[in-house]
Regions:
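Active-site Tyr-X1-5-Lys
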Residues: 3, 43-71
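Mid/C-terminal beta-alpha module of Rossmann-like enzyme folds, strongest
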Residues: 113-172
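Alpha-helical substrate-binding/gating segment
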Residues: 79-95, 100-128
């Protein structure tokens, strides 16, 4: 599809990737660093994450062939319809997809992320951006949940700093800087 559109002159693309491109759906997953960067490598073991990673790689391949195209790959968080947002997560056992359960955005914000990406000025290149809320979907500090899941396997010091206790597990600074997107429906607003 990309090649077809490129051959017909389309210059701008916004593609739906997933925060699962890093491979978090496997219980053996441990991030390289926290918060998880936009360009975190794929450490997938189950097949789902690598399918998203391959899509991102195909977009890079297409760009190498046509360096005048603008591609934004949004690594989208778990998305819930606005009137069916789950309760905030507490400490619980690590299961498949656990990280997705604390990285939630409502549908209105997800649509806004895509809209703002489409409306963002044309900029040739390939960009990968975490499209998640700025806060984790938790009722307790993130470090407590991650320590319960991963023990001392991962450096949690970022979440132990004052003011970062409830921050998203994913770094959202690039999407904020480049397209101005910040999810509006955060746990504090939704749960009050």
């Amino acid at each position: 599809m990309l090649r077809y559109l490129i051959n017909r002159g389309c210059k701008k693309y916004v593609l739906a990737s997933s925060i699962a491109a890093v491979g978090f759906q496997d219980r053996k997953f441990r991030p390289v660093n926290l918060p998880i960067a936009d360009d975190h490598p794929c450490l997938d073991r189950s097949g789902y994450g690598i399918s998203k990673y391959f899509m991102e790689e195909i977009s890079k391949y297409c760009y190498r062939q046509s360096e005048d195209i603008d591609i934004i790959n949004l690594r989208l968080s778990s998305v819930c319809v606005d009137n069916n947002i789950p309760p905030l997560k507490d400490i619980s056992p690590l299961t498949e997809w656990s990280l997705g359960g604390i990285t939630i955005m409502n549908l209105t914000d997800a649509i806004r992320a895509f809209t703002m990406s489409v409306e963002n000025p044309y900029k040739p290149g390939v960009r990968i951006m975490n499209a998640t809320g700025p806060k984790a979907w938790t009722s307790v500090p993130v470090a407590e949940i991650l320590r319960n899941w991963w023990g001392d396997d991962v450096d949690l010091s970022y979440f132990e700093q004052s003011g970062n206790e409830y921050d998203s597990v994913y770094d959202v600074s690039r999407i904020q800087q480049e397209i101005g997107f910040i999810a509006l429906n955060t746990p504090e607003i939704t749960s009050s």
